[in-house]
């Protein structure tokens, strides 16, 4: 039988069988321990059931995409959820999430929640930066369901993951979409104005002819598994200019006659995005030096 992993808890995986409402609890075969392949939420798998009615994952089919921390496979799009206030926006963290989406070939849509707390005009430079990078933006108030109809339309025929830091309203958004309190939603700490890590586990849910993954809200994101060569291809607004640089393999850093740096000077690429790229590039280069 074949199906999709919709949940994983304590070494057990719950598989929704194709063309059926049946969900079967399985464990992964021991052979997976000897490989680098570990079952992930969203994996399309083949399973067997023994004479004792115990399920086992026999095969994991090739993944179309992978998202790490949290681990989710075969996602087609990411709703990158942030707020301008409560908690305050962290631009570097937003850029890291977008970077990870690009690395995994995920369509990223930026969702700003809690818009009732702010005046959008006060954040027009941030908004301009994101739009200039080519990302769609949706402005939300999930509690009052403002623009949640747009989110529901996006879900259809997609496998969608909610990404973003703790406390921005990812679980609230999911609750509104599916119409019940599926995940425990924590209150914001008054002292820190940051969310509690209250989402218990990752789970894939069938909603509106699509699949949703609700993921734990992390306040930091590690991208150290990437290399500087990966970084070059994960800033989409660079792509129109890369072939115009004087030097093949230009890192758009200290090289002369760099088309990307010229585009920044002329306002075609937002300076904050370029500064984030340089900061991240230098972190990668320093990490490589330490390895040697």
From Swiss-Prot:
Positions contributing to GTP binding: 113-116, 164-172
GO MF term set: GTP binding; GTPase activity; metal ion binding; rRNA binding
UniProt xrefs under SUPFAM superfamilies: Nucleic acid-binding proteins, P-loop containing nucleoside triphosphate hydrolases
Cofactor note: Binds 1 zinc ion per subunit.
PROSITE patterns reported for this sequence: ENGC_GTPASE (PS50936), G_CP (PS51721)
KW Cell inner membrane (keyword) present: no
Domain CP-type G: 64-221
EC number: 3.6.1.-
Function, as annotated: One of several proteins that assist in the late maturation steps of the functional core of the 30S ribosomal subunit. Helps release RbfA from mature subunits. May play a role in the assembly of ribosomal proteins into the subunit. Circularly permuted GTPase that catalyzes slow GTP hydrolysis, GTPase activity is stimulated by the 30S ribosomal subunit.
Record HAMAP family: GTPase_RsgA
Protein name: Small ribosomal subunit biogenesis GTPase RsgA
Gene name linked to the record: rsgA
